[in-house]
Swiss-Prot record:
It is found in: Cell inner membrane. It is a multi-pass membrane protein. It comes from the Bacteria. GO terms for molecular function: lipid-linked peptidoglycan transporter activity; peptidoglycan glycosyltransferase activity. InterPro entries: FtsW, FtsW/RodA. This is Probable peptidoglycan glycosyltransferase FtsW. Peptidoglycan polymerase that is essential for cell division. It catalyses: [GlcNAc-(1->4)-Mur2Ac(oyl-L-Ala-gamma-D-Glu-L-Lys-D-Ala-D-Ala)](n)-di-trans,octa-cis-undecaprenyl diphosphate + beta-D-GlcNAc-(1->4)-Mur2Ac(oyl-L-Ala-gamma-D-Glu-L-Lys-D-Ala-D-Ala)-di-trans,octa-cis-undecaprenyl diphosphate = [GlcNAc-(1->4)-Mur2Ac(oyl-L-Ala-gamma-D-Glu-L-Lys-D-Ala-D-Ala)](n+1)-di-trans,octa-cis-undecaprenyl diphosphate + di-trans,octa-cis-undecaprenyl diphosphate + H(+). The lineage of its organism: Bacteria, Pseudomonadati, Pseudomonadota, Gammaproteobacteria, Methylococcales. One of its GO terms (biological process) is cell wall organization. PANTHER family: CELL CYCLE PROTEIN, PEPTIDOGLYCAN GLYCOSYLTRANSFERASE FTSW-RELATED. It is an enzyme of class 2 (transferase). Residues 42-57, 114-121, 175-177, 221-289, 340-355 are periplasmic.
Length: 398
């Protein structure tokens, strides 16, 4: 790619002393748009719930505003981290993530919600540790690929070794239990290894093994099997196992093309469980109709496109770690948003996955914003490399 082309596509240039930060304005605009859109919809979906739980209609909107501010701070902090520093500590971060997964399973430390022990309290904020592990897993796999690219491309061992370490995290996630996060982590890793050039037959074989393992896990856990059966025919038991899905489908049916109007949802009024978190997309479909739901899908498609484009730019600049980290973040966010929306629309069995940047929650918001911040850093370093500025042309990092 020519220097002239890079200069024309470098986006917003922020200056700080002698340093510069090359900001992706498209990614910034779309990310802020999703956060603002999510805040409006969380407010709409939770006013009645706040009144019931805390005698304050704006209880959840006020907390979500704090979550957004914390997320912006996390994104700012992540954008300040030098990529070589992150790569150097990628293995340590991975084992720190494993330690968090162990910590949450210790009685008295992990917090149980709806029968799952997935949260710990950090500085007054309830954090879902699986969200943190998704990011550190992507960082670890990117670091592994940058160190062992030839092995990944030529040897079965090159794929099995990182997946075997991730399997440790998968086992701990399943103990919570969190099957959805397990699927996202493993699928993201497989996607990154595939993009690294792993042999097709090895990739297909491992994909088949993962699929078989997933099937076994479904059939050996009654609650997972019940979710799959209710997905196949939610109307067979609409008041029990199929309740969430049937209520979500009713929400989309009521929304039709243009929706019933912002704030006018009926399903959010104690019919649709987790309307402000996992099933926020159903409220969007009901209140804003097909056009609102399609807008959200397009915004997430742009986020994934920018992540992959940033990864390609970093790969051309010669920074493999940055490239595959961007690819991993793109796969993760795209897959998680697809699963969440698919569950809401009845395309997939029910999973406990949030809609990135939109659903209510502080831990998820901070982690996803940190991932977006890393994308900004990756792009800035890649553009600086093409412009010949090197480290001297960047904002100072840690």
């Amino acid at each position: 790619m020519s220097t002239q082309a890079i200069r024309g596509a470098r986006g917003l240039v922020l200056k700080w002393g002698a340093g510069r930060f090359y900001l992706d304005t498209v990614l910034l605009s779309v990310s802020l748009g999703l956060m603002l859109f999510g805040f409006v919809m969380v407010s709409s979906a939770s006013l009645h719930l706040g009144e019931k739980m805390a005698s304050d209609s704006f209880y959840f909107p006020k907390h979500q505003l704090v979550h957004i501010l914390l997320g912006l701070a996390a994104g700012w902090g992540a954008a300040r981290v030098r990529l070589d520093t992150l790569e150097r500590h990628s293995r340590s971060l991975f084992w720190a993530g494993i330690a968090l997964l162990v910590l949450v399973l210790i009685p008295g430390v992990g917090k149980s919600v709806n029968g799952s022990v997935r949260w710990i309290n950090l500085f007054g904020l309830r954090v879902q540790v699986s969200e943190v592990f998704k990011l550190v897993a992507a960082i670890y796999v990117a670091g592994y690929i940058s160190r062992h690219l030839d092995t990944v491309r030529t040897s079965v061992k090159g794929m099995i070794f990182p997946l075997s370490l991730l399997a440790i995290g998968a086992v701990l996630l399943l103990k919570e239990p969190d099957f959805g996060a397990t699927a996202v982590v493993m699928a993201t890793a497989l996607g990154m290894l595939f993009l690294a050039g792993a042999r097709l037959w090895v990739f297909v074989g491992l994909l088949g093994l993962v699929a078989v393992a997933g099937t076994v896990l479904i059939y050996t856990a009654e609650y997972r099997l019940r979710r799959v059966l209710s997905f196949l025919d939610p109307w067979a038991d609409p008041l029990n196992s199929g309740f969430q899905l049937t209520q979500a489908l009713i929400a989309f049916g009521r929304g039709e093309w243009q929706g019933v109007g912002l704030g006018s949802s009926v399903q959010k009024l104690f019919y649709l469980p987790e309307a402000h978190t996992d099933f926020l997309f159903s409220v969007i479909g009901e209140e804003l109709g097909l056009w609102g739901a399609t807008t959200v899908i397009l915004l997430f498609a742009i986020v994934v496109w920018r992540a992959l484009a940033i990864g390609r730019l970093a790969e051309r600049s010669g920074n493999l770690f940055a490239a595959f980290l961007a690819y991993g973040i793109g796969i993760w966010l795209g897959l998680q948003s697809f699963i969440n929306m698919g569950v809401n629309m009845g395309m997939l069995p029910t999973k406990g996955l949030t809609l990135p940047l939109m659903s209510y929650g502080g831990g998820s918001m901070m982690v996803v914003c940190a991932a977006i911040g890393l994308l900004f850093r990756i792009r800035s370093e890649a553009v600086a490399s093409f412009l010949g500025n090197g480290r001297k042309g960047l904002w100072p990092g840690v």
